[in-house]
Amino acid sequence: MIRAAALLLAAGLAAPALAGDASGFDPASIDQCLAAAPTQGARADCAGIGMEACLAYAKGKYSGDDPDFPMANCLDASHQAWEAKLTATYDAALTAEGTKPQEMLRRAERSWLQFREDLCNQARAAAPEGQGELAAARCLRDETARQTALLLALEPAE
């Protein structure tokens, strides 16, 4: 059942399982947490922000028989929000005035993408039976949040 939920999420078909909004995840919670975080480490700790509200919402709306579906749904929504934040941060770093090592940043980001994929595949493989998809989803979310925090730390001070 977990694999079915993960496949639905990957195919973008999770929305019909929940009434209304697919997740209840509020991407603004990420911006609020990042704005309040004074250090790179504190920003990376924002990875799980918004999950409690999302889970409460998803559990109230989901009527299926897979107990892991609300968690998978919220992890996916959280990861997608972090991915959007990372992309915006990366694009800003590439276009920042005075940013000369753009090719180095591009290479680093490509290497990081491969690292994240391999790390999260390892998390999937190492997880207890039936928990691999959730472990991989959590890994994707957490690593994307960490990378966002790292790129934010590289921004020049205003």
Explain the meaning of each model-derived region.
Residues M1-L7:
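Bacterial N-terminal signal peptides that target proteins for export
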Residues A14-P16:
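N-terminal signal peptide c-region/cleavage motif recognized by signal peptidases
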Residues L8-G12:
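Sequence termini and other peripheral, non-core segments
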Residues A19-E158:
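N-terminal alpha-helical modules
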